């Protein structure tokens, strides 16, 4: 058997050092994402301040459909994103096998890349819904985005109805009556949303990569003050980084193998992909929370609405608040 050379030993030590450094950065960033969980768990108790920009977005708009049409539509995606980031943090912490830790030592690459894609896309949706400075457009996007959700829901109805049709005896059940009532209410909501669309400016609704790119482009134009990165607004800016991330992670989500072309050295490249994905997802989520809070707070007066987000986001909250006057 050939003995390892000095160069082999040096390369092994260097790789180990790189791995440890990357894992430390990944863990630190993932924990930042998990620090948003208290906000996600409690913000709905007092969603917005009276007199805030978001409160005025909601006031008198689509009240037959929901009392919080704009704020409520924007809230769910970022809560979904934070849940994914919390799972990422737990997954990364659980792999630590250094020292006395008895973690798996497994990168769980597919799981981490899938979760971070989910988080980034959901957080980007909140940014996209709220970033337009025109109240009429924010209202329009909330209505049209909700309508697009209902369009997707129709496929669920079709499969559910087919199941009941396949087993006619079930049509005497409480479950079938509840399903019919749900469809009736669904049809009513569709009509309400049609009226809402007639009352607001036209706007295109997209999802996935478009939303991620749109949110990242907005951040290039309005750099978050809590993030010292010099990436924003460059010729190759955050929009480009986010698009690259989304393409690669989407391939993993759909079971495609082409990302393996960019892992010639195996573990190190894999670890770098994970840390980049965590960075982008946490950045999107922090910015979504800050943008929501910039519009949810009444900055002209003191209120008893609790501050649930990390203090580090405050500079971005204050800077972006100026873009959304309540009146």
Please provide the spans of the model-predicted regions:
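Long, hydrophobic/aromatic-enriched structural stretches that serve as scaffold segments
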Residues: 59-132
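Short, glycine/acidic-rich hinge or "gate" loops at secondary-structure transitions
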Residues: 97-101, 130-142, 296-307
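Secondary-shell segments that build the walls of catalytic and ion/ligand-binding clefts
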Residues: 1-76, 149-297, 303-327
